[in-house]
Amino acid sequence: REVGLRMEDQIRLLEIRDEGEDRFVVFCGEHKRPDDRWIIRFRKNEAGNYEPYGIAKRMMQRRAYYLQPLGGYSGDPEVCYAIWNESEQLMEARFRPNDGPTETVRIAPAPSLTIWRFQGGEDGWHLESHYYDSAGNEM
């Protein structure tokens, strides 16, 4: 709700996903820029409540799917790469982090949120990504 107030708009929740100690929330504005998608990462504290980690980030749009890397917690090199899928065609992503081996990630049918985790380095990270439909064609 606080984010909606800052955006001067009502927000519509699209997904709330709990994964271990993390909670991810994907949302959009009802009226202003309704085609934008936003994501925020929360972390469970000692009391068992979720606290926001960082601020809401606008996801990068590529056709009918949206992408956003979310960094780790204070010194943690883990990166969570978020894919919000609204495409009926998107089925698979292939990632090559830090010039390492390629990893294939299945994307659930739309609408869906996929979180893929990888390790960055001390000096940051680099990621090549490609997205494919069910016939194996790059999108």
Regions from the language model: what does each represent?
Residues 1-51:
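N-terminal export/targeting and maturation segments
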Residues 10, 36, 77, 101, ...:
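Residues that act as N-cap/strand-start positions at coil-to-secondary-structure junctions
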Residues 44-55, 96-98, 134-136:
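Surface-exposed loop/turn elements that mediate protein-protein interactions on large endomembrane-trafficking
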Residues 84-85, 139:
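Short, solvent-exposed mixed-charge patches
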Residues 86-92:
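A short, structured loop/turn motif at beta-sheet edges
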Residues 93-139:
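Ser/Thr-rich low-complexity repeats and stalk/linker segments
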